[in-house]
């Protein structure tokens, strides 16, 4: 009967100890889970801050400084368009107009009508697009005005990104994060090291107490199965008696340890709640900076749109320059062709004169031969005409018409 009391008392104590330890461990686990979730959130914030830092540096140095200021505004727009392209426009505008003036100054000697509009070579060339480059040159000041405005917007944006967004807004969030969430913070040390270590120690104490109570219960159950005559009965009974006398003290220590766990958790959760509020504030500040980055991204799209307009202007100018260059080459070849035409006319005149001289010489030689032929015919008739009947060679014997006929025409050049 006495042994059964030991068993019942140890069972009751074990159940109570298990409930106390389980509840305490559950509260510790919940606190750890909340803190683990918080640590992941902090890691995410740390990651986002590093991303924003890198993105800010990329926007400032690569996109704004190098991409927009150096490559786009200074090289592509200012140098390439306002200087190089304007120089090309002026050169070819002067070139085409000078070429037309040259054609206007060359008299068309082939036109004998003094009142004709085609008295000079300029009459034969189109003047519809001669002023196209002049028009493009007149657009350059307007393009320069827009580029200057863009440069002003760029300077404003660069200062905003550098001085306000990076050096002020982002830096303030970084400093807030470092002050409140890095390991050298007192509260962070308590949450990551001091209090967790204490909770682990208390968990070990609870485990030891529960192990002692469980061991006492197991020994009580074993004693219940033994008989007084068994060899181990007396020694085990003495152990169970001694442990039973200490049972209340162990339970008291266990309860005190549970209370200490709760006090530690209270301190832990108090600090954690404060740090969680700071995390929410940090999130608020962080997402404010992210919104600023989005706004600046929209500003960058404006540069892209303006760049497209200026690129279209440049492409149009280059196309007009190429057309004007081709026109200049055509006009130069027209001038050369006209000079070659004059040479060709002289060559043809020379050929025509040679032909005329040859034909005149031919006529003279034929005339001489014909005179000789006429004499020979007369002599023939004197000697033979009276003896030959006419019908032996009808219409031919006494025919004194020339043996040749010569018809020709030479074009007047």
UniProtKB/Swiss-Prot annotation:
Entry membrane topology: Peripheral membrane protein
Keyword list, A-Z: Autophagy, Coiled coil, Cytoplasm, Membrane
Pfam families cross-referenced by the UniProt entry: ATG17_like
Subcellular location per the Swiss-Prot or TrEMBL entry: Cytoplasm; Preautophagosomal structure membrane
Molecular function GO terms recorded: molecular adaptor activity; protein kinase activator activity; SNARE binding
Recorded GO CC terms: Atg1/ULK1 kinase complex; phagophore assembly site membrane; vacuole-isolation membrane contact site
UniProt record, GO biological process: autophagy of mitochondrion; cellular response to nitrogen starvation; pexophagy; piecemeal microautophagy of the nucleus; positive regulation of autophagosome assembly; positive regulation of autophagosome size; protein localization to phagophore assembly site
Residue ranges crossing the lipid bilayer per the database entry: none
Disulphide bridges, residue numbers: none
Protein function: Autophagy-specific protein that functions in response to autophagy-inducing signals as a scaffold to recruit other ATG proteins to organize pre-autophagosomal structure (PAS) formation. Modulates the timing and magnitude of the autophagy response, such as the size of the sequestering vesicles. Plays particularly a role in pexophagy and nucleophagy.
Family indicated by similarity: Belongs to the ATG17 family.
Name by which UniProt lists this protein: Autophagy-related protein 17
The organism's taxonomic lineage, starting at the top: Eukaryota, Fungi, Dikarya, Ascomycota, Saccharomycotina
